[in-house]
């Protein structure tokens, strides 16, 4: 006999619940979630939520796990409805809810609902800095107050800061360049929060944050300055050489030449004695060369003020800018043509080469 997971009584063969118990449980979830939604809309006091939660627990088989899941669901819904500017009333409301709902913070946040709420509020406070409504220190102070109620890991905190930086970058780069005042704001932001525009995690590659870092470097090169952001690269640089950028997971291909002889065999054969045949003529042919691109492996492509440097597990190569006679850009890489005798073409694949083209244009 199966046992009902709600009331604990016999549920019959091959069954784990009574239909009426399941319906009562579903009704309880609807009642609880409706009350929580009403609370976040400001229409129901917290005392009523506590009463409803106790009632459905006793009469509708609502467990603490159910209460946590319903709380998480309704918090996500509330997070999607509130918008910047945020006020202390938002923080007071969630603080009151967490303190009185009767389940742990960790259980409510099992799916990350409280983290998402905190990150959204932090982005809002940082938006006030980028729009000139608050100094950065004040926005940071308010964010720290929020995180005392809604704690975040360092990783999730930085995710919120980076996401706001990306939104700011999208606005700043509408015309392709940042103004001096916008650059100053970005420098203060990343300097204060310990962020970077060049040593980015893979998830931020190809985002406005990467574009801002590249735009800042190009602006410094154009002005004759050493770029303000230092790239920590595991390569040996020459005297006066500075590393600007690094593209990871780049595949290098190098042109190879295959030579073979193509021709035909002429002449005829005749029998001399049994078992012995004599053949006249011979092979006439000519060499034919074909070129192909050989995969040289995956590695990192570094851009400096003097070279393009590829560091891979199978092969590494340094290409001086002075030896480059042409670059053919692709949507996902570039072909490099070099000066010199018997120098083969190189293809680098797996990145947007726009930044390299701009560096070459400014340096040369």
Q: Where would I find each of the regions flagged by the language model?
A:
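Short, cysteine/histidine-rich loop/knuckle motifs that typically chelate Zn2+
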Residues: 5-8, 19-23
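Amphipathic, non-membrane alpha-helical rod segments
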Residues: 46-64, 77-105, 132-152, 178-199
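Short Cys/His-rich "knuckle" micro-motifs
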Residues: 12-17, 28-30
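Acidic, Ser/Thr- and proline-rich intrinsically disordered linker/docking segments
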Residues: 235, 297, 302, 309-364
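Structural recognition of alpha-solenoid helical scaffolds
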Residues: 31, 48, 52, 66-74, ...
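Anionic N-terminal interaction surfaces
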Residues: 139-144, 205-300
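Short metal-binding segments enriched for Cys and/or His
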Residues: 25-37
């Amino acid at each position: 006999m199966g046992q009902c997971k709600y009331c604990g009584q016999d549920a019959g063969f091959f069954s784990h619940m009574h239909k009426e118990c399941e319906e009562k449980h579903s009704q309880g979830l609807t009642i609880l979630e409706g009350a929580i939604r009403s609370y976040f809309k400001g229409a129901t006091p917290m005392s009523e939520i506590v009463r409803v939660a106790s009632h459905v627990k006793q009469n509708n088989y609502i467990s603490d796990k159910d209460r946590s899941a319903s709380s998480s669901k309704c918090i996500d819904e509330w997070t999607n409805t509130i918008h910047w500017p945020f006020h202390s009333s938002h923080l007071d409301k969630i603080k009151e809810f967490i303190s009185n709902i009767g389940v742990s913070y960790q259980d409510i946040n099992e799916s990350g609902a409280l983290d998402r709420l905190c990150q959204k509020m932090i982005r809002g406070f940082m938006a006030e800095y980028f729009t000139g409504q608050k100094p950065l220190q004040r926005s940071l102070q308010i964010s720290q107050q929020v995180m005392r109620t809604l704690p975040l890991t360092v990783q999730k905190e930085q995710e919120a800061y980076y996401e706001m930086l990306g939104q700011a970058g999208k606005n700043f780069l509408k015309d392709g360049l940042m103004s001096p005042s916008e650059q100053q704001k970005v420098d203060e932001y990343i300097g204060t929060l310990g962020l970077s525009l060049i040593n980015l995690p893979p998830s931020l590659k190809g985002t406005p944050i990467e574009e801002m870092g590249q735009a800042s470097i190009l602006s410094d090169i154009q002005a004759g300055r050493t770029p303000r952001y230092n790239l920590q690269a595991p390569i040996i640089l020459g005297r006066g050489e500075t590393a600007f950028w690094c593209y990871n997971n780049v595949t290098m291909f190098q042109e190879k030449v295959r030579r073979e002889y193509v021709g035909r065999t002429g002449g005829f054969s005749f029998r001399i004695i049994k078992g012995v045949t004599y053949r006249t003529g011979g092979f006439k042919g000519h060499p034919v060369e074909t070129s192909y691109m050989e995969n040289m492996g995956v590695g990192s492509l570094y851009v400096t003020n003097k070279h393009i440097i590829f560091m891979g597990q199978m092969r590494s190569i340094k290409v001086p800018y002075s030896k480059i006679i042409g670059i053919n850009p692709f949507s996902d890489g570039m072909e490099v043509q070099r000066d010199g005798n018997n120098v083969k073409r190189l293809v680098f694949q797996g990145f947007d080469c726009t930044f390299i083209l701009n560096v070459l244009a400014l340096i040369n």
